[in-house]
C-alpha cells in the first residue's frame, strides 16, 4: 500500500532520516524528517493557478508544536493547542526567510508550508529539523523552486565552532547562530553573540554553510528518486509596446521625484506622477489594465534607484553610500516611567521605556524544550501612524514579534544576571516614525533607556542596518538604509553590538545568495557605523544611573531558616498576604529561605523585615510576650504572640482564683501579656496570663506595656 522513499545521512554527530510517500499523500508533497528522535512532518500545498488580480507572492509558512511530541497534555483550559506561541512564530519566520527568494519572481500561486513537530528529543531542537524538511518538501513537490537549501546551527565554545550544539551546550556557548543557504551562497543568518569580533562571526557563517552541504546533496539525491515533475512555468514577458508608452518626460518626472529627500513629500509627488501616467495610458489603450502599468513603473523606479547607487551617485536622501543619517538622542523624557529614551535617526524614531518589576513579573515559558523563566522582556510596537497610514490595531504581528526578538538578542550579552540585579526588566519600543531600520533604532533606544533606569548593563549597544545593490559582479554596500532602499535593494543586513564586538546579526536576502566577500564588506562598514552611533549615544549617557527611579520598586533580600517558611506564609497564605498589606510591600519566598521584599520606600522595607524577624523568632519558654486574643472558647482563650504564633491560655491560667466564664475577663482583640509555660512536641504553646502578671514586677516585658486596666482588674 505504501512505497516510501527514504534517505539517510550523517550530519556531523547526528543521524538524519528523510522519508516521503508514507504520510499526507494528498498534499502536493510531504516529508517526515527525523534527527535523533526529533521528528517533524512537513507538507506543502500549492494552487495550480494564481488568483485573478494577484500582485504579490502568497507564501505562508506555519510551524506548529504538538504537546504529545514530549508526552504531555496541554495545561490550558481546553487541553489542546491553541494560537501559536512566540517560539512557533519565530520559527515560522526562520523557515520562511531563506526559501522565499528561491521562488521565481513572477510566480504568484498560493503556497502553504506546514511543519508539525510530532516527536522531540530534548537534545535536538526541532527548528533546524523543520528547516531541512521545508527545503526537502519544496524540492520534491515540482513547484517552481530554484534549488534546495541547507540549515545549520553554529555554536562557539572554548574558541571552537560547534555544529548543531545541544541546548545544554548552547548554555556554555558564546554564539547561537542559524545559517541557511544554497550550494553556492548564503541566504539567511540569525544570531545572538557574546560580543564576538567581525572575523569570528564571518567564520561562523562560513563554517555553517560548509557543513550544511551534506544536507543539500542528500536532498538532491532524494529528488532524483522521488521528485515530482516540475510544473510548467513561463516568466511574465514584458510588454515592450506598453513600456514605450512611458515617455521620456514621464521618466524625467519620476527621476526628479527621487531627488526629494523628505519621505512624505516624495511619496506624494510620486503618487501624483504615477496616477497621471496611468490615467493617460488607460485612455490611450483600453486593452491594458492599471496593474500592468504599475508593474512597468515599479521596474523603472527600481532600476533608477539601483543604477544611481551603482554609479556612486547620491542616494535617495542625498547621502553617499557610507553616510549615517542625522542622529538625536535624549533620556528621561517621561516623568513617571522607570527609564525612558527617545532615539531618532533621520526619519526613523523610537520611544523606548524600561520598567522594573519583581520576581512575580517573571515570564514563564513552557514549550517542548521545557519550562523556564525569563527576567528580561522586550516588546516592539509598530503603529500605522509611524508611516503616515491608518490601520487595524490588535495583538502583535509576526514582524513585531521578530523585531522584538532581534532587539532582545542584541542586548542579552550586556544584561546583568538576576543575582547582580534582582529585577524583572521589561523594555518596550514604540516606533513613532519609520523610514528604515526601526529594529536597530529600538536597540539604540533600549540601551539608553536601560541606563536611564539604572540597569547596570555592561556596555552601550547600538545597531545599524546595511543594504546591498548587486548587478552581476558589481555590488555596493549601503550604510543605514532607508525603507525604499530596503524595498528596492537586494539585502537587509542588520548588525548590533558594543564598541568591542557583535551581539546580534540578522541577514535576509532577496536575491539568490551572498558571497563571503560581500559579507566581509558589510561587516566592515557596519562596524564603522556602529562606533559612530555609540559615540553620539555616549554623549547623552555613557553608564547606568547610580540610583533607580523613585517610582520603581526597591528590592531587599533577607535569609531565614527554611523550616520557618511555613510560619511566614501561614495557612493558605494568610500571614504573608496580611504582612504585604500591613507593610505595603511585595514579599516573595523561595524554597531555600531567601526572601525578597519589594517596596517603594526603605522605611516600608525595613518594617517588613522587622515583622518577618518577629515571625521567625524562636519562642522561649519562661519569656513574657505581648499578645492579642484571637479566639475565645469555654475552656480558655487563644492568644497570638510574636506576630503569627498562637498559644492557649487555659481558663485556669487567666487569673488567680476560680474563673467561671472566660468572657468575664477577656474579649476578642484585647491586648494582654502572657508567659510561655511550655511548648510540646507538636509545637503547641501553653500560655499563662496570671503568671505574667505575677512576674511583671520582676521581669521586663519585651514588647509594649501591658494593658494597665486589664492588669488592675486581675488584681481586684
From Swiss-Prot:
<dbReference type="Pfam" id="PF03726">
    <property type="entry name" value="PNPase"/>
</dbReference>
<feature type="domain" description="S1 motif">
    <location>
        <begin position="622"/>
        <end position="690"/>
    </location>
</feature>
<dbReference type="InterPro" id="IPR012340">
    <property type="entry name" value="NA-bd_OB-fold"/>
</dbReference>
<feature type="binding site">
    <location>
        <position position="492"/>
    </location>
    <ligand>
        <name>Mg(2+)</name>
    </ligand>
</feature>
<dbReference type="InterPro" id="IPR004087">
    <property type="entry name" value="KH_dom"/>
</dbReference>
<dbReference type="InterPro" id="IPR003029">
    <property type="entry name" value="S1_domain"/>
</dbReference>
<dbReference type="InterPro" id="IPR027408">
    <property type="entry name" value="PNPase/RNase_PH_dom_sf"/>
</dbReference>
<keyword id="KW-0808">Transferase</keyword>
<feature type="binding site">
    <location>
        <position position="486"/>
    </location>
    <ligand>
        <name>Mg(2+)</name>
    </ligand>
</feature>
<protein>
    <recommendedName>
        <fullName>Polyribonucleotide nucleotidyltransferase</fullName>
        <ecNumber>2.7.7.8</ecNumber>
    </recommendedName>
</protein>
<dbReference type="Pfam" id="PF00013">
    <property type="entry name" value="KH_1"/>
</dbReference>
<dbReference type="InterPro" id="IPR001247">
    <property type="entry name" value="ExoRNase_PH_dom1"/>
</dbReference>
<dbReference type="InterPro" id="IPR036612">
    <property type="entry name" value="KH_dom_type_1_sf"/>
</dbReference>
<dbReference type="InterPro" id="IPR012162">
    <property type="entry name" value="PNPase"/>
</dbReference>
<keyword id="KW-0460">Magnesium</keyword>
<dbReference type="GO" id="GO:0000175">
    <property type="term" value="F:3'-5'-RNA exonuclease activity"/>
</dbReference>
<keyword id="KW-0694">RNA-binding</keyword>
<feature type="domain" description="KH">
    <location>
        <begin position="553"/>
        <end position="612"/>
    </location>
</feature>
<keyword id="KW-0963">Cytoplasm</keyword>
<comment type="function">
    <text>Involved in mRNA degradation. Catalyzes the phosphorolysis of single-stranded polyribonucleotides processively in the 3'- to 5'-direction.</text>
</comment>
<dbReference type="GO" id="GO:0006396">
    <property type="term" value="P:RNA processing"/>
</dbReference>
<dbReference type="Pfam" id="PF00575">
    <property type="entry name" value="S1"/>
</dbReference>
<dbReference type="GO" id="GO:0004654">
    <property type="term" value="F:polyribonucleotide nucleotidyltransferase activity"/>
</dbReference>
<comment type="similarity">
    <text>Belongs to the polyribonucleotide nucleotidyltransferase family.</text>
</comment>
<dbReference type="InterPro" id="IPR020568">
    <property type="entry name" value="Ribosomal_Su5_D2-typ_SF"/>
</dbReference>
<dbReference type="InterPro" id="IPR015847">
    <property type="entry name" value="ExoRNase_PH_dom2"/>
</dbReference>
<dbReference type="GO" id="GO:0006402">
    <property type="term" value="P:mRNA catabolic process"/>
</dbReference>
<keyword id="KW-0548">Nucleotidyltransferase</keyword>
<dbReference type="GO" id="GO:0003723">
    <property type="term" value="F:RNA binding"/>
</dbReference>
<dbReference type="Pfam" id="PF01138">
    <property type="entry name" value="RNase_PH"/>
</dbReference>
<dbReference type="GO" id="GO:0005829">
    <property type="term" value="C:cytosol"/>
</dbReference>
<dbReference type="InterPro" id="IPR036345">
    <property type="entry name" value="ExoRNase_PH_dom2_sf"/>
</dbReference>
<dbReference type="GO" id="GO:0000287">
    <property type="term" value="F:magnesium ion binding"/>
</dbReference>
<dbReference type="Pfam" id="PF03725">
    <property type="entry name" value="RNase_PH_C"/>
</dbReference>
<dbReference type="InterPro" id="IPR004088">
    <property type="entry name" value="KH_dom_type_1"/>
</dbReference>
<keyword id="KW-0479">Metal-binding</keyword>
<dbReference type="InterPro" id="IPR015848">
    <property type="entry name" value="PNPase_PH_RNA-bd_bac/org-type"/>
</dbReference>
<comment type="subunit">
    <text>Component of the RNA degradosome, which is a multiprotein complex involved in RNA processing and mRNA degradation.</text>
</comment>
Amino acid at each position: 500500500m505504501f512505497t516510501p522513499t527514504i534517505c539517510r545521512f550523517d550530519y556531523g554527530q547526528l543521524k538524519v532520516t528523510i522519508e516521503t510517500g508514507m504520510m499526507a499523500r494528498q498534499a502536493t508533497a510531504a516529508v517526515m524528517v527525523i534527527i535523533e528522535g526529533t521528528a517533524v512532518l512537513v507538507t506543502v500545498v500549492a494552487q495550480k493557478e494564481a488568483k485573478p488580480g494577484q500582485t504579490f507572492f502568497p507564501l505562508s509558512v506555519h510551524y506548529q508544536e504538538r504537546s504529545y511530541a514530549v508526552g504531555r497534555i496541554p495545561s490550558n483550559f481546553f487541553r489542546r493547542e491553541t494560537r501559536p506561541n512566540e517560539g512557533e512564530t519565530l520559527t515560522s519566520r526562520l523557515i520562511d526567510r531563506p526559501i522565499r527568494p528561491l521562488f521565481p519572481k513572477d510566480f504568484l500561486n498560493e503556497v502553504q508550508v506546514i511543519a508539525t513537530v510530532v516527536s522531540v528529543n530534548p537534545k535536538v531542537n526541532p527548528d533546524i529539523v523543520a528547516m531541512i524538511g521545508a527545503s526537502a518538501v519544496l524540492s520534491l513537490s515540482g513547484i517552481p523552486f530554484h534549488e534546495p537549501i541547507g540549515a545549520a546551527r553554529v555554536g562557539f565554545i572554548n574558541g571552537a565552532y560547534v555544529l548543531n550544539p545541544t541546548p545544554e551546550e548552547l548554555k556554555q556557548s558564546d554564539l547561537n547562530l542559524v545559517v541557511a543557504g544554497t550550494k553556492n551562497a548564503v541566504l539567511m543568518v540569525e544570531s545572538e553573540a557574546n560580543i564576538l569580533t567581525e572575523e569570528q562571526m564571518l567564520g561562523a557563517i562560513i563554517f555553517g554553510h560548509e557543513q550544511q552541504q551534506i544536507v543539500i546533496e542528500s536532498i538532491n539525491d532524494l529528488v532524483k528518486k522521488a521528485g515530482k515533475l516540475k510544473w510548467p512555468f513561463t516568466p511574465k514577458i514584458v510588454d515592450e509596446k506598453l513600456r514605450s508608452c512611458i515617455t521620456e518626460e514621464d521618466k524625467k518626472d519620476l527621476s526628479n521625484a527621487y531627488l526629494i529627500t523628505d519621505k512624505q513629500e516624495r511619496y506624494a509627488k510620486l503618487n501624483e506622477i504615477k496616477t497621471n501616467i496611468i490615467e493617460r495610458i488607460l485612455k490611450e489603450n483600453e486593452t491594458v489594465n492599471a496593474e500592468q502599468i504599475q508593474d512597468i513603473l515599479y521596474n523603472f523606479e527600481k532600476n533608477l534607484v539601483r543604477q544611481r547607487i551603482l554609479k556612486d551617485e547620491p542616494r535617495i536622501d542625498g547621502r553617499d553610500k557610507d553616510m549615517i543619517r542625522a542622529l538625536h538622542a535624549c533620556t528621561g523624557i517621561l516623568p513617571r516611567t522607570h527609564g525612558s529614551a527617545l532615539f531618532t535617526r533621520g526619519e526613523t524614531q523610537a520611544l523606548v521605556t524600561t520598567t522594573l518589576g519583581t520576581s512575580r513579573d517573571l515570564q514563564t515559558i513552557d514549550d517542548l524544550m521545557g519550562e523556564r523563566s525569563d527576567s528580561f522582556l522586550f516588546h516592539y510596537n509598530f503603529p500605522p501612524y509611524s508611516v503616515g497610514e491608518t490601520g487595524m490595531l490588535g495583538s502583535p504581528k509576526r514582524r513585531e514579534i521578530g523585531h522584538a526578538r532581534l532587539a532582545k538578542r542584541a542586548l542579552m550579552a550586556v544584561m546583568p544576571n538576576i543575582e547582580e540585579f534582582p529585577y524583572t526588566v521589561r523594555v518596550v519600543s514604540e516606533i513613532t516614525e519609520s523610514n528604515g531600520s526601526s529594529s536597530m533604532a529600538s536597540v539604540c533606544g533600549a540601551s539608553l533607556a536601560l541606563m536611564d533606569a539604572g540597569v547596570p548593563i555592561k556596555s552601550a549597544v547600538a545597531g545599524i542596518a546595511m543594504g546591498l545593490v548587486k548587478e552581476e559582479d558589481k555590488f555596493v554596500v549601503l550604510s543605514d538604509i532607508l525603507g525604499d532602499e530596503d524595498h528596492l535593494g537586494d539585502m537587509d543586513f542588520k548588525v548590533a553590538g558594543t564598541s568591542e564586538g557583535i551581539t546580534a546579526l540578522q541577514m535576509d536576502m532577496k536575491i539568490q545568495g551572498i558571497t563571503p566577500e560581500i559579507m566581509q564588506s558589510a561587516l566592515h562598514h557596519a562596524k564603522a557605523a556602529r562606533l559612530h552611533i555609540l559615540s553620539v549615544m555616549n554623549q547623552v549617557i555613557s553608564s547606568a544611573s547610580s540610583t533607580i527611579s523613585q517610582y520603581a520598586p526597591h528590592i531587599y533580600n533577607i535569609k531565614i531558616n527554611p523550616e520557618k517558611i511555613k510560619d511566614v506564609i501561614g495557612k493558605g497564605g494568610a500571614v504573608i498576604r496580611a504582612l504585604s498589606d500591613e507593610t505595603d510591600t511585595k514579599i516573595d519566598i523561595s524554597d531555600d529561605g531567601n526572601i525578597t521584599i519589594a517596596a517603594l520606600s526603605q522605611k516600608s522595607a525595613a518594617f517588613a523585615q522587622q515583622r518577618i524577624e518577629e515571625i521567625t523568632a524562636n519562642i522561649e519558654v519562661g519569656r513574657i510576650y505581648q499578645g492579642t486574643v484571637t479566639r475565645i472558647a469555654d475552656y480558655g482563650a487563644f492568644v497570638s504572640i510574636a506576630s503569627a504564633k498562637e498559644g492557649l491560655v487555659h481558663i485556669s491560667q487567666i487569673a488567680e482564683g476560680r474563673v467561671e466564664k472566660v468572657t468575664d475577663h477577656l474579649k476578642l482583640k484585647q491586648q494582654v501579656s502572657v508567659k510561655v509555660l511550655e511548648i510540646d512536641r507538636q509545637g503547641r504553646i501553653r500560655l499563662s496570663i496570671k503568671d505574667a502578671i505575677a512576674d511583671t514586677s520582676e521581669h521586663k516585658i519585651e514588647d509594649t506595656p501591658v494593658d494597665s486596666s486589664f492588669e488592675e482588674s486581675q488584681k481586684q
